[in-house]
Amino acid sequence: MKKRMTIGAALLATSLALGAVLLNAAGPNPPQWRGNHKIDPTADIHPSVILEGSVTVGAYTKIDAGTVITGNVTIGHHSLIRCNTTIRGTNRIGNYTHIYDNVCIEGGRPAKIGTSRAETPDQSIIGDHCWINHGATMHGTQIADRGAVGLNGCCDYNTRIGAGAILANGSATHTNQVIPENAFAEGVPAVVKKENITDEDRLDYFGVLPEGWTTFEGEGQEKRARARQQKQ
């Protein structure tokens, strides 16, 4: 018996298919796009962005100048990737997620090949409403929904950051480190300094509430995209 597609999945598939048709109708992809890509027609991608491999970009997502994305990468809807970010390898990035300038994200290690301790391949998965601040570096890291990495934070191989947790500015994890859900971790190597943080704690630390800001900006990206469509 065939599985029924959810309404959301059906809409995404239809939107991506339409995007492929519109891109083809508009002519060849930019010369710096190499590979097989599925770009939603509402996505806003700067002309200088480099895409290689198989890259999927969802509705109303914005990717700024100088970004390089290579490999098998999926980016959800209403997300924001700022200037000069590098994403390579196999990566999955969720919806309404912000990745700021000069961030480096890589898929991580393959399964054990004699030169690493990885028993299974690392996974690079970033959830919804996540906040990856300027200059962060992440190797095969998993971040659950609403998780955050501060300015110049470093996540070594197979780091796992729980839902709503924060890795503080300038902090670094070691390989296989786990930061629990709603924990605040700081230092090199990072140590949990506070558990069960609240939105008030997040506001005090960041000055804005990441989930609220990513929602606000995502809605703005959609509004601007719709305005561009009306002018065409």
Task: State where each predicted segment sits.
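Glycine-rich hexapeptide-repeat left-handed beta-helix
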Residues: 25-38, 94-232
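A short mixed-secondary-structure module that forms the rim of ligand-binding clefts
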Residues: 78, 82-84
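Bacterial N-terminal signal peptides that target proteins for export
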Residues: 1-11
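Residues on the solvent-exposed faces and adjacent turns
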Residues: 47, 53, 65, 71, ...
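Extended, small-residue-rich solenoid/repeat segments and analogous flexible loops
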Residues: 5, 15-68, 74, 78, ...
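A structural connector/turn signal
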Residues: 34, 46, 50-52, 70, ...
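Right-handed parallel beta-helix/beta-solenoid
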Residues: 69-73, 86-93, 119, 143
